Amino acid sequence: MSILIDEKTPILVQGITGDKGTFHAKEMIAYGSNVVGGVTPGKGGKTHCGVPVFNTVKEAVEATGATTSITFVAPPFAADAIMEAADAGLKLVCSITDGIPAQDMMRVKRYLRRYPKEKRTMVVGPNCAGIISPGKSMLGIMPGHIYLPGKVGVISRSGTLGYEAAAQMKELGIGISTSVGIGGDPINGSSFLDHLALFEQDPETEAVLMIGEIGGPQEAEASAWIKENFSKPVIGFVAGLTAPKGRRMGHAGAIISATGDSAAEKAEIMRSYGLTVAPDPGSFGSTVADVLARAA
């Protein structure tokens, strides 16, 4: 089983006719994702990457029954693309775009709260690698061949560390149910907590690897929630152990600005709530293997 997407999930690609949209739409289709259409204003009626193109998300949903989209839209227009998808009734939107202004994402968050919670669109990203349920569907930009189907969930703020974890686990014969890149921006569409709750409900996910980084309270909040609400083993990691205070390290949200933001502090918080913490990125696979062996 998996969370968020599977082989039947009907997917739209917003911005499909651009260079990035074209490349990754082809990659997703080749992987086996159920891409049913694309959206580019002014290019409706054409066929691209073997699927129909529509002018609006609403038109695309009405014609294809899509429930999910991935957006390859430039930063100045990315927030509007997310809100258009929400207005069309999509359940899930994955925003790959890096560089969306924080004020725009605040506007998106406010806009989505207009909808009742049960009808509210889940946004994954922005500035993320996307989602993959190995062997079923890929909604993102990750190299699909490094993922082995299995029973470990992965949630990561960093796309490339998520890749590293997948590659190490595959070498050890450990598979992944779903891997979610939530993105490295200060304001995310969804958090560790949102996806942990889904993994808790998935009977075929037996453990979760949670990869965080410096900056923000997400890791501490998730660790506290895990202690009280999560029944499966969780392996944690926090990138940025050597990062100096006040200096951004890669992602816009990766900056130590308050007590509890540093990697060492977050790792200690994880341990205090019962998580097993991987000591370094080279130990993802071995740490997951040790935890699974103890839980068997």
UniProtKB/Swiss-Prot annotation:
<dbReference type="InterPro" id="IPR036291">
    <property type="entry name" value="NAD(P)-bd_dom_sf"/>
</dbReference>
<dbReference type="GO" id="GO:0000166">
    <property type="term" value="F:nucleotide binding"/>
</dbReference>
<dbReference type="Pfam" id="PF00549">
    <property type="entry name" value="Ligase_CoA"/>
</dbReference>
<dbReference type="InterPro" id="IPR003781">
    <property type="entry name" value="CoA-bd"/>
</dbReference>
<comment type="pathway">
    <text>One-carbon metabolism; formaldehyde assimilation via serine pathway.</text>
</comment>
<keyword id="KW-0816">Tricarboxylic acid cycle</keyword>
<keyword id="KW-0436">Ligase</keyword>
<feature type="binding site">
    <location>
        <begin position="96"/>
        <end position="98"/>
    </location>
    <ligand>
        <name>CoA</name>
    </ligand>
</feature>
<dbReference type="GO" id="GO:0009361">
    <property type="term" value="C:succinate-CoA ligase complex (ADP-forming)"/>
</dbReference>
<keyword id="KW-0547">Nucleotide-binding</keyword>
<dbReference type="GO" id="GO:0004775">
    <property type="term" value="F:succinate-CoA ligase (ADP-forming) activity"/>
</dbReference>
<protein>
    <recommendedName>
        <fullName>Malate--CoA ligase subunit alpha</fullName>
        <ecNumber>6.2.1.9</ecNumber>
    </recommendedName>
</protein>
<dbReference type="GO" id="GO:0004776">
    <property type="term" value="F:succinate-CoA ligase (GDP-forming) activity"/>
</dbReference>
<feature type="binding site">
    <location>
        <position position="43"/>
    </location>
    <ligand>
        <name>CoA</name>
    </ligand>
</feature>
<dbReference type="GO" id="GO:0006099">
    <property type="term" value="P:tricarboxylic acid cycle"/>
</dbReference>
<dbReference type="InterPro" id="IPR016102">
    <property type="entry name" value="Succinyl-CoA_synth-like"/>
</dbReference>
<dbReference type="InterPro" id="IPR017440">
    <property type="entry name" value="Cit_synth/succinyl-CoA_lig_AS"/>
</dbReference>
<dbReference type="InterPro" id="IPR005810">
    <property type="entry name" value="CoA_lig_alpha"/>
</dbReference>
<comment type="similarity">
    <text>Belongs to the succinate/malate CoA ligase alpha subunit family.</text>
</comment>
<dbReference type="Pfam" id="PF02629">
    <property type="entry name" value="CoA_binding"/>
</dbReference>
<dbReference type="InterPro" id="IPR033847">
    <property type="entry name" value="Citrt_syn/SCS-alpha_CS"/>
</dbReference>
<dbReference type="InterPro" id="IPR005811">
    <property type="entry name" value="SUCC_ACL_C"/>
</dbReference>
<dbReference type="GO" id="GO:0050074">
    <property type="term" value="F:malate-CoA ligase activity"/>
</dbReference>
<comment type="subunit">
    <text>Heterotetramer of two alpha and two beta subunits.</text>
</comment>
<feature type="binding site">
    <location>
        <begin position="17"/>
        <end position="20"/>
    </location>
    <ligand>
        <name>CoA</name>
    </ligand>
</feature>
<feature type="active site" description="Tele-phosphohistidine intermediate">
    <location>
        <position position="251"/>
    </location>
</feature>
